[in-house]
């Protein structure tokens, strides 16, 4: 894991990484921009449940309040779902600005890969 003062790794995800368990990184744009509320939240939670049923740990990746998040809580997924398209769609170029401004960002595939790598996924 790359130590970064802006990175928060969910405790369940951190434990899975330490123990060598499989972790699946998921982008968050589908939650904020892909579907309307509440279907977006229901779908995101269902995908996480299916991943757990298959023996892996889900790590939905997002930026909340300028913090890079590797693994969201159900409450954070709900927050993202309710805010919807009011959340910035965050690509690589947006990371520094969102962190500096303390804003939220829904990760694209590229940004998801960057944050997942930082977290050791």
Task: List each language-model region with its residue ranges.
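Amphipathic coiled-coil/heptad-repeat helices and related helical stalk/stem segments
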Residues: 9, 108-109
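N-terminal glycine-/serine-/threonine-rich phosphate-binding loop
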Residues: 1-54, 118
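Internal, conserved structured core segments that host functional sites
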Residues: 109-121
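A short, small-residue-rich loop immediately preceding and capping a beta-strand
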Residues: 97-101, 119-121
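Glycine-rich nucleotide/cofactor/substrate-binding loop typically near the N-terminus or early
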Residues: 28, 33-35, 39-98
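Active-site nucleophile and cofactor-binding loops and adjacent substrate-binding regions
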Residues: 101-108
């Amino acid at each position: 894991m790359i130590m970064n003062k802006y990175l928060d790794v969910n405790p369940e995800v951190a434990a899975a990484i330490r123990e060598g368990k499989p972790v699946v990184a998921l982008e968050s744009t589908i939650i904020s921009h892909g579907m309307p509320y509440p279907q977006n939240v229901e779908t995101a939670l269902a995908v996480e449940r299916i991943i757990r049923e298959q023996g892996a740990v889900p790590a939905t990746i997002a930026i909340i309040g300028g913090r890079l998040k590797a693994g969201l809580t159900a409450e954070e997924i709900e927050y993202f779902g309710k805010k919807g398209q009011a959340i910035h769609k965050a690509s690589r170029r947006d990371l520094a600005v969102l962190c500096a401004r303390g804003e939220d960002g829904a990760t694209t595939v590229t940004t998801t890969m960057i944050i997942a790598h930082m977290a050791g996924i």
